[in-house]
Structures are given as C-alpha cells and as structure tokens.
Curated annotation (Swiss-Prot):
This is Histidinol-phosphate aminotransferase 2. InterPro entries: Aminotransferase_I/II_large, HisP_aminotrans, PyrdxlP-dep_Trfase, PyrdxlP-dep_Trfase_major, PyrdxlP-dep_Trfase_small. It comes from Cupriavidus pinatubonensis (strain JMP 134 / LMG 1197). One of its GO terms (molecular function) is pyridoxal phosphate binding. It catalyses: L-histidinol phosphate + 2-oxoglutarate = 3-(imidazol-4-yl)-2-oxopropyl phosphate + L-glutamate. Homodimer.
C-alpha cells in the first residue's frame, strides 16, 4: 500500500500534467518493428569492432567537455553548416525543442506549427507554459500559406516550426510557401523565430541549411537518429551564434554524454556508410509505396522521409490484423481529423519490407 497522500500530489503537481498520459512506447519484442522511423541497419561488423575499441578508451570517470568542440566542428564540416554559423547540441532534438520553449516562455508567448505535425512542438510548449497554436494543413497535407500567414498575424507567435519533411505525413512543404512564412516572420506580419526541423533530411536530400545566412530569424534543427544512431540520442540546431548563445543558457550542463559524443564522432568519420544506408532506404521506400498502392482502397501519400503514410478503409482493423501477424506499425488515425484511417509505416530492410507487404495484403483481405 502506498504511503503517499493523493491530496499532496494534487497540491504539488500541475492540473494539466496530472491530466496527461505519459508518452507510450509499445512493446515490440518478437515483432517486425516498423513504428518508430528507425534506420534498420547497424554499422558493418568491422566498424562495430573499431567503434568498440574507440569507446573502450573513453574516460567514463570524467564529465563531458561541456562545449563538445570536436563534435561540433565535425558536424559543421560534414553537414555543411555555412561559415559564420554555429551548432548547439541536445540530448536528441526533443531536448532542443524543450530548450527553445523554455527560453521563449514569456507570459502570453505562443508556439505555432502546421498540424498534423510532430507532437513534441505542442507538448514542449505546454510543459513550459506557452500556448500552442496548430494551423491545419490542406486535405492533401500541403501547407496552407494563407492560413499560416493569417494565424501568424493574429497570434504573433514567438516560435514557428516547419518540419521539412513533415511528420507524420512525410511530405516536403512547398519551398516558396516556406520562404513566404520565414519572410513574413521577419516583421511584415509578425516577429518570430522560424525553426525548420530537418529530422528526416537524409531521406529528403533537400535542406534549408544553406539559407541560414539569408535570414536572421531562421534556425535549422536536425537529429542523428534517422541516420542510424537513434540509440545515442543526439540532436543539434544550427544558426547564428547570437541565437545559440541564448539557448545555451538554458541547456542542461553535460547534456551530451561522453559515449554519445565518441559514437557520433566515429559515425561522422564514416558518414559514407550512413549515406549508403539512406540511399538503400530511399530505394525501398519507392518499392514499398508501389506495393501498398496496388491494393484497392489504399492511398499512399508522397513521402520524402523514411516512412510512408497511407489511408486504408479501416485503420484500426488493419493495424490489429498486422499486429496479429507480428508486424508493428503506427496507427495515427486518432492524432488529427485529417489523418482519418491513416497508418504510418517505417521503411526497413528488403526482408522486413517483404514481410510487411505480405502481411499488409493479407490484412486487407481478411
């Protein structure tokens, strides 16, 4: 029996937090795991052995170097961060989103993003006490420029997020629409920081990184998770040092551990291997999309990510039938009305994709 008085919890913990549910990660043991947009490929055995030796030299008894200078320099080199721009590291991009919300949390401040979109934009805003304003996409998941500009004028957001490509829809927003939003946020409509979230850039091969020098209100955020390093939890944001100097003030000390730093440095030294894996997944994406779309009643939406969004006649039923066949995907149909009967499927290895397509066909026929 618990010795905790529930009334004490009610007194201490915020009402909105008590009303929430914790982020749920489903058990994937024994399943073909296609729910979390992970890169299915590990490093080749020779590189794994080399990495193990490298990690064996890491001084676990010492705190990390707070500035992570070597890793930041390597990221700027490999990811072609423009001269004069800097990078700030986070324990995954989730932490960077939280830092942005915390740093911008003035009374009455708001965060804005198209919806459906990445759930952490809204969650981090709520945790920090900011209001989140979601602006619906069009029915085909394209960006509604007019609606965005009108909402920006009305709400005057502190931060506007644009995911490129978007999660969970997978599409790239029109570049002209995005530029109109960035320019409008420079003062003609509102004065806002625009954060372009490029978590899936390895699969999109499109980027706003080179535009950082064009706009003083622009940051570009990425993660190494989708490159095949989800287990080390490393995200980074690139932009003008004046912005990053402010974010650094709310960054937890030693937030990137020594094993993460060493692993990321090693992987960036062998980025050609990761690029090859991304190319394989892009090729598989086309094959899986064609296989899914071959079934009547199934609509597969264009994707520039390592996952596919599809609308099926009955999302809940199809999800359950796939799970019964040991295939785990993501049922996103309850996330937003625009996602009615939609499922999100991670693109994986040829073998796992074949298992999925076979199970998918059978699930539609049951």
């Amino acid at each position: 029996m618990s010795v905790v008085d529930p009334s004490l919890i009610e007194r201490i913990i915020r009402d909105d937090v008590r009303a929430m549910g914790a982020y749920h990660v489903p058990d994937s043991h024994g399943l073909v795991k296609l729910d979390a947009m992970e890169n299915p490929y590990r490093l080749p055995p020779a590189l794994r052995s080399e990495l193990a030796a490298r990690l064996g030299e890491v001084a676990l008894n010492r705190y990390p170097v707070p500035s992570s200078e070597a890793l930041r320099a390597k990221l700027k080199e490999v990811m072609q961060v423009p001269a004069g721009m800097e990078v700030l590291l986070g324990n995954g991009s989730d932490e960077i989103i939280s830092m942005l919300a915390l740093a911008a949390a003035r009374p009455g401040a708001k965060v804005m993003a198209p919806v459906p979109g990445f759930v952490m934009y809204a969650m981090s805003a709520q945790f920090a006490g900011l209001e989140f304003v979601g602006v619906p996409l069009r029915a085909d998941f394209t960006l509604d420029r007019g609606a965005m500009l009108a909402a920006m004028a009305e709400h005057q957001p502190a931060i506007v997020y644009l995911a490129y490509p978007n999660n969970p829809t997978g599409n790239l927003f029109d570049a002209a629409d995005m530029e109109a939003i960035v320019r409008a946020a420079q003062g003609s409509v509102c004065r806002s920081l625009v954060v372009v979230d490029e978590a899936y850039q390895p699969f999109a091969q499109e980027s706003w990184m080179s535009r950082l020098t064009d706009f003083g209100n622009l940051l570009v955020m990425r993660t190494v998770s989708k490159l095949g390093l989800a287990g080390i939890r490393l995200g980074y944001v690139a932009g003008d040092p004046q912005w990053l100097e402010q974010l650094d003030k709310v960054r937890p000390p030693y937030n990137v551990n020594v094993l993460t730093e060493a692993t990321a440095l090693f992987a960036l030294e062998h980025v050609a291997v990761l690029d090859e894996q991304a190319a394989q997944l892009r090729a598989e994406r086309s094959r899986v999309a064609e296989g899914m779309a071959a079934h009547g009643g199934v609509t597969v939406f264009p994707s520039a990510a390592n996952f596919l969004l599809a609308r099926v006649p009955d999302a809940a039923q199809t999800f359950d039938r796939l799970l019964a066949r040991k295939v785990l995907i993501k049922n996103v149909s309850k996330m937003h009305p625009l996602l009615a009967n939609c499922l999100r499927v991670t693109v994986s290895t040829p073998e796992e994709n074949a298992q999925f397509l076979e199970a998918f066909a059978a699930s539609l026929q049951d």
